[in-house]
Amino acid sequence: MFFYLSKKIAVPNNVKLKCISWNKDQGFIACGGEDGLLKVLRLETQTDDSKLRGLAAPSNLSMNQNLEGHSGAVQVVTWNEQYQKLTTSDQNGLIIVWMLYKGSWYEEMINNRNKSVVRSMSWNADGQKICIVYEDGAVIVGSVDGNRIWGKDLKGIQLCHVTWSADSKILLFGMANGEIHIYDNQGNFIMKMKLNCLVNVTGAISIAGIHWYHGTEGYVEPDCPCLAICFDNGRCQIMRHENDQNPVLIDTGMYVVGIQWNHIGSVLAVAGSQKVVTQDKDINIVQFYTPFGEHLGTLKVPGKQMCSLSWEGGGLKIALAVDSFIYFANIRPDYKWGYCSNTVVYAYTRPDRPEYCVVFWDTKNSEKYVKYVKSLISITTCGDFCILATKADENHPQEENEMETFGATFVLVLCNSIGTPLDPKYIDLVPLFVAMTKTHVIAASKEAFYTWQYRVAKKLTALEINQITRSRKEGRERIYHVDDVPSGSVDGVFDYSKAIQGTRDPICAITASDKTLIVGRESGVIQRYSFPNVALIQKYSLDCRACQLSLNCNSSRLAIIDIAGVLTFFDLDTRVTDSTGQQVVGELLKLERKDVWDMKWAKDNPDLFAMMEKTRMYVFRNLDPEEPIQTSGYICNFEDLEIKSVLLDEILKDPEHPSKDYIMNFEIRSLRDSRALIEKVGIEDASQFIEDNPHPRLWRLLAEAALQKLDLYTAQQAFVRCKDYQGIKFVKLLGNLQSESMKQAEVIAYFGRFEDAERMYQDMDRRDLAIGLRMKLGDWFRVLQLLKTGSGDADDSLLEQANNAIGEYFADRQKWQNAVQYYVKGRNQERLAECYYMLEDYEGLETLANSLPENHKLLPEIAQMFVRVGMCEQAVSAFLKCNQPKAAVDTCVHLNQWNKAVELAKSHSMKEIGSLLARYASHLLEKNKTLDAIELYRKASYFFDAAKLMYKIADEEAKKRTKPLRVKKLYVLSALLIEQYHEQMKNAQRGKVKGKNSEATSALAGLLEEEVLSTTSRFTDNAWRGAEAYHFFILAQRQLYEGYVDTALKTALHLRDYEDIIPSVEIYSLLALCACASRAFGTCSKAFIKLESLETLSAEQKQQYEDLALEIFTKHTPKDNRKSELNSLLEGGEGKLPTCIATGSPIIEYQFWVCKVCKHYVLAQEISNYNFCPLCHSSVE
């Protein structure tokens, strides 16, 4: 960080100033002094010249108003920035609130206690409240509209300072005796503050300043110290909060008059005076510190006595009240920034996030990439890469085998130019100073430095990635103590214990090139090492403490900027004789410049460099300066006689919207002179000048000028001198052209004036060349336009190419509908298929598939598209069209179209369908999805397997004994599947014997085949038994409830044949009930005998049946009244009559109806009452 005095404003009549305050938002400067002096000034930057921005732009006083109202010396001035108010107070205790009206300041409110003098006033963070403290201990808190909120008298206490906390909940009162008391916002005392900085201090002390940064622009680090308290004896403490037990302690070694944080709380300015040992007087100085107590530098200020200081709102200037003058100093902050491959990388803090926001701004394409990085320490760049040095996250997993003794507390993150992290390296060394070359990163703490040979992904092989630990042993990572004398051997040990060994002479700066590493130490010693094999070559001794070091492109000279901003140069290899007559290596060059805050060597010339001195940029060639350029930019790059600089001050005013206007390009004098010579004198003289001052950029400039004049000889010579092979080829191409106008057109195109070149081609009637030019540029819209507008027929292949290229243009931007139109014209079926798919236009995709010839290479892709969206039929069609039946079957299986899969497998004689079905069915059964498995088998025409599973479900449901109708339906479904199985077997056999004797023969053979297979299951022979059992069971009960007791008994008697399906107890209980109702007590008696003999019943249940039987048969004789009618049912046997499935009665007539599906009978007179079979519910025809 550098600072220098830039402006001085005198107060009329030599009136001594007492206080100064700079409004952070609007830029007004209020200063108060003796005899009631109160002035409001405003410095405004002139922006007439767009090149001059920021600090480099001239500034004038746009306001200089004297405010009349105070009679005594004005001692306190404070701004309310939110409400544009100024509050001032004088030695008589008079307080005036001023307001801005039509560009001038006017009194708004006046208050005078007439008892005591105001010592301090402070507005809270949102500008709603002001706290005023008087010397006699009175405290008043008022609102912005002038109303008093509360007041308090602190008896026996002299107050001198007050400040609010960021959340307005705490007030700190500074006492005249040096104590600080903490109060809440209602004026209740909480506690005294512990002042660690005053330990062992004796004598009277007073508070010089209290400033609590409110975090309005974010914090440089989470939990960052922000409350600064400083005493007149120079002791200072910076606290994280009012109860911080471990504050940062500073002894400034000066008499302090005031302190203030900058706008983001990153720099604390401490103003006062210091005794000079050599002179018997005090000098005014401002010292700058970080929130962690690190000293950033000292600014010396002329004059007798400084009384106050105030920062500008952007932190780029500071105003100092000294005697009767206001001095302004410019600040050049140490921004965290870098420049790599057209990308400016910069970091800033935001109030809404604890991390740093790191922006990678591609200045070429105006694209921005943002990363959030916790505890960022620095940004270092080189080539196409950058290193972000940060503190390690405490809970972040470290690399395997990374740290054995020490926990890695810092990370070096290698990123590319868009912020993608490529390789993080965890180290246990504070990276205070980081340098980077094309192959290495060097990080240094105060005691040691670490080197890491980084590699980027394109160079890494899989083998190398797996050898991280070994590569470390081979020397990719090394660590050296600054006091060591390394020999350059690679057998050193990677040992972090070196990093914690102390040194009396700490490191203060480092720099490196591909072959040299320079380490600067606080004593002024410069150590030079060979690189990358680190060996100490030389030690040099200088009389300054380096702050910034830089090597030129051939590592022969070192530029040093010290902490006072003095730039010197050291020649590393020159041998000179010192004062003792000894020959030494290295010489300090005579050039010395003051107030320098940035410098950059040219990448391609060891004698060229650019430096920033105050608000001027100087370019030096062989230590001779060119005329300065007014700018305040930070130098990004110096190459090809051009300097690129970036106005970081302007960018960071609005970091989210960087503008290309803030990138400045400057040409050095030799480039400007060469251009002027070429334009005004001619190519020959310019050629001679460039010969005397050779540089590839100048030769290129000459070559381009010669090309424009078609001086091909000079152009070729110049291209040879700047080693531009493409340029040489282009000149040869021009030499082969006959027409001058053709040459001219080619040159115009070479310089990028494509519209003019095209016009010339068309004027020459060479539409083909115009089209060729546009094709090279990739301007296919114009190509298409030229093809269509020509008089002759357009080339079909070119038209297709243009249409396809435009299709690609739209497809890249995901404008699929537009792309389709051009792909259709370009007959690009592959891309057309993709567009249809992205548009979900499956009809178009199907039409495309149908239009393709068989075995076209695109068909499998289209089929896969259909598969992905579940369109089985279209996918199968496409697969079959390209002769991939296996893929078609797999698709059917994948989409659960098993019947289609079986059909395909059969038609293409594929054997694996059975195993596929079995595998999928077992998967469904494992998940207890039996019905899904049945459906699967049924769809695949595996009726027998489906029937087995359905029969199993019916059996399980029957065991529940709840819903007999549901059980009947399940048995019916099972039987129907068996019937379909029988039919399938017959049809299969018919197919086998086709062409044999007769249809009867084939039917018989089918039955025989079926008979063999049907022995595999007990239910295949009589599939309808279960359905019959539950049909009669339900029918009997329905008939009984409807009062047809005789019919119910006949039906119930059938149930005796189904004891294997329905429990005997239910059958005989129903039979006994029906027989009793029908007064067939003989049948009833037999049913009771059967019930009493059942072994499944408990003794208690048997007893209940016996009691019931006793009750019935004591009243009725166990004989059937109508025995003759029941004979046929009771006897059974071979001559058993068929049963009517509708009534349960035996069929004795010759005419009856037979169901075609289940083969059961119904009485002829009964069937007229039914539309469907009573058992299987098939249609009655």
Curated annotation (Swiss-Prot):
UniProt main location, coarse: cytoplasm
Subunit composition and interactions: Component of the IFT complex A (IFT-A) complex. IFT-A complex is divided into a core subcomplex composed of IFT122:IFT140:WDR19 which is associated with TULP3 and a peripheral subcomplex composed of IFT43:WDR35:TTC21B. Interacts directy with IFT122, ITF43 and TTC21B. Interacts with IFT43. Interacts with CFAP61.
First and last residues of every WD repeat: 12-51, 69-108, 113-152, 154-193, 502-539
Taxonomic source organism: Mus musculus (Mouse)
Protein name as catalogued: WD repeat-containing protein 35
UniProt cross-references to PANTHER family, sorted A to Z: LD29485P, WD REPEAT DOMAIN-RELATED
Key words of the record: Cell projection, Cilium, Cilium biogenesis/degradation, Cytoplasm, Cytoskeleton, Repeat, WD repeat
Cited Gene3D superfamilies: 1.25.40.470, YVTN repeat-like/Quinoprotein amine dehydrogenase (2.130.10.10)
Subcellular location: Cytoplasm, Cytoskeleton, Microtubule organizing center, Centrosome; Cytoplasm, Cytoskeleton, Cilium axoneme; Cytoplasm, Cytoskeleton, Cilium basal body
Cellular component aspect of the GO annotation: axoneme; centrosome; ciliary basal body; cilium; intraciliary transport particle A
Pfam families: Beta-prop_WDR35_2nd, Beta-prop_WDR35_TULP_N, TPR_IFT80_172, TPR_WDR35, Zf_2nd_IFT121
GO biological process: cellular response to leukemia inhibitory factor; cilium assembly; intraciliary retrograde transport; protein localization to cilium
Known function: As a component of the IFT complex A (IFT-A), a complex required for retrograde ciliary transport and entry into cilia of G protein-coupled receptors (GPCRs), it is involved in ciliogenesis and ciliary protein trafficking. May promote CASP3 activation and TNF-stimulated apoptosis.
